[in-house]
Amino acid sequence: MRRLLLAVCGLALVAGCGRVPLAPLAAGDFRLYEAASTSSSQLVAVINPHSQIAESRLPLGALSPDGAHLYTVSSNTLQDIDPHSGQVVRSLRLPGSFNLPPATLGGIPGGLSQNGEWLVLQTSGAQASSHMLLISTAQLKVTNAIDLDGTFVFDAIDNTGTRLYLIEYTNITQGYYRVRVYEVGAGQLGPYTVIDKGGNGTPEPMTGVRLSGVFSPDGQWLYSVYARQGSGAFVHALNLTMPFAFCLDLPNSGSPADGFHWSLALTADGKHLYAANGAMGSVTQIDNLDGYNPSIVRTKQVGVPGATANALVQNVEAKELGANGAVLSHDGATLVTTGTTGLIWIDTATLSARSSQLTKWTVWSLLASPDGSRVYALNDAGAIAELSMPDGRMGSTFNPAVGSPIGLLRVEAG
């Protein structure tokens, strides 16, 4: 009888609450790499979610895809730092003042190929001539010095180190540019302009500010999202084996600020790309099933559980969240993206919102753990939250107090 009463009481509790409350999420065994700035420097903090402190602080730089190298530039010297020990493994004296190109609008450094075998450094500022260095990371050696008349900035380097993609500004005042290919073996610019294969075949001036980008797993594509004043945002799908690209227009709300809130997430097989904008409540799916023709297959307004229309309006001061504003589960079934405030869990089968979390946070950056079990969110005050990828359960929240946040660079197994 006692067992029966306990069973009945248990059922009553479930019926009264609707479901059994989920257990709190235990801290995962991971290390976080956060880029931050202080009054005196920019840095990369290595953070332990268990102890909730920064175990080490390193100079701001570009992390290799495997997390084994941190490349930094200081005082005309390129350094290869072991992120785990903090020791300088190798260094290379540079022939002048060069910098790591930015990978995101928020200032996270880039310049690496998808496989991490090549690194490009460039001079800064709009000048009458442009200078870059192509470096083999295996040897930490300059293989090519590129000197060009005009204003060029780095866009991408392919995995073979033979094709350097550059943005050439044709009108600095208007912000017009075009994409060119520097043929490394020939030591010269190709005589062609990278064309929009989805257009009319005629090169046209491009405009826009690059927010962030993601490589395909095979290194054949670089997908970048750009915001344009008055024209909405677009995804620039750049083929890194041939001189062509696709420009895929994203929905335009008419608000210039909204265009700065697009983020990209790519499935593990590289076939499905999601462009998400929490400020607009919009998600666009781009498929590249054959590996040659990326195209928009659907766009949907995402209803956010418990949110009002006003909750989908962000201010332009938080535009840097475009660095890492969306992540996917390993199976591609769940998309987590930043909303106006907090995070939104989206079912990719229907592109409908399932739940939301951290509704009082302005999320600055977002990454997933390598095993796909955790989501780590960084807010504008530098606090970090750990959540479950499958169901959004909350884990710990803490502030490691490493400085003003720039973004999360990497999550790796502890």
Task: List PLM regions with ranges.
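C-terminal motif of bacterial Sec signal peptides marking the signal peptidase cleavage site
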Residues: 14-16
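Repeated scaffold domains used in trafficking and secretory/extracellular systems
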Residues: 20-24, 57-68, 73, 97-112, ...
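Blade-level signature of beta-propeller repeat domains, shared across WD40, Kelch, NHL, RCC1
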Residues: 378-414
